Amino acid sequence: MKNELICYKQMPVWTKDNLPQMFQEKHNTKVGTWGKLTVLKGKLKFYELTENGDVIAEHIFTPESHIPFVEPQAWHRVEALSDDLECTLGFYCKKEDYFSKKYNTTAIHGDVVDAAKIISPCKVLDLGCGQGRNSLYLSLLGYDVTSWDHNENSIAFLNETKEKENLNISTALYDINAANIQENYDFIVSTVVFMFLNRERVPSIIKNMKEHTNVGGYNLIVAAMSTDDVPCPLPFSFTFAENELKEYYKDWEFLEYNENMGELHKTDENGNRIKMKFATMLARKK
């Protein structure tokens, strides 16, 4: 597990004189964040605390110490034990949280994280990639990623981020309604995109996606629905009806198919995330 952690923020080297006060008082790491202390010189005392500030355990760390990660949300504080102290702190997270923590992007779609556990690195098209939350993660895992979106600002952000992270992602401005994928891919991803497409173009778009997926390859679609029991609360240009997406892919093998309630990141007038029904499908081409 710890081998899967990646550093998203490294603090400067601190001495006894500039060790931040907040770290010398009771504090904890965020959800999904592990702390990695490194003592370069001198001695540092580390206190494990309860939420009330009671000491559970004390440790003295030196450059020779094998210092374990500070677990997420674990209460602790530190204290300089020598005048020559030099230490630093790195913040670590799982790969799926890396870009959201480092760049404050929207979290990677959970179905993409799940799909990556069963689909080995391959040639991927992220169709309607937005700022690249899914593309960046898949590239980090070693997939050969192509990312298309119609929004210039989103593609510009993705290009800037991939350069900073030294990731090889091919990007382009693209109107999905054109249904003009020309190369073949092993995995085509489209999460929360179909609701912005032209209704009359959807059959052509899906046909084009299916035709340009290699045999044995996968399509992952997460899309808004509107059904009699749960009408879509927002005026999207397209929503799937009950079993409509399933019907489009009836000649493929379904690894996952469900039509469940979900939430948008968008909130209503009371600040609550908008709830609606989504079709989620991971299918393999026979």
Swiss-Prot record:
GO terms for molecular function: methyltransferase activity; S-adenosylmethionine-dependent methyltransferase activity. It is an enzyme of class 2 (transferase). Induction: Transcription is significantly up-regulated during growth in iron/heme-restricted conditions. InterPro entries: DUF1971 (IPR015392), RmlC-like_jellyroll (IPR014710), SAM-dependent_MTases_sf (IPR029063), TehB-like_dom (IPR015985), Tellurite-R_MeTrfase_TehB (IPR004537), Tellurite-R_TehB-2 (IPR014431). S-adenosyl-L-methionine binds at G128, R133, D149, D175, I176, T191. Its EC number is 2.1.1.-. One of its GO terms (biological process) is response to tellurium ion. GO terms for cellular component: cytoplasm. Pfam families: DUF1971, TehB. Keywords: Methyltransferase, S-adenosyl-L-methionine, Transferase. Probable S-adenosyl-L-methionine-dependent methyltransferase. Plays a role in both resistance to oxidative damage and heme uptake/utilization. Also protects H.influenzae from tellurite exposure in vitro; however, since H.influenzae grows only in humans, it is unlikely to encounter tellurite in its natural environment, and it is thus probable that tellurite resistance does not represent a biologically relevant role of TehB. Belongs to the TehB family. This is Probable S-adenosyl-L-methionine-dependent methyltransferase TehB. The gene is tehB.
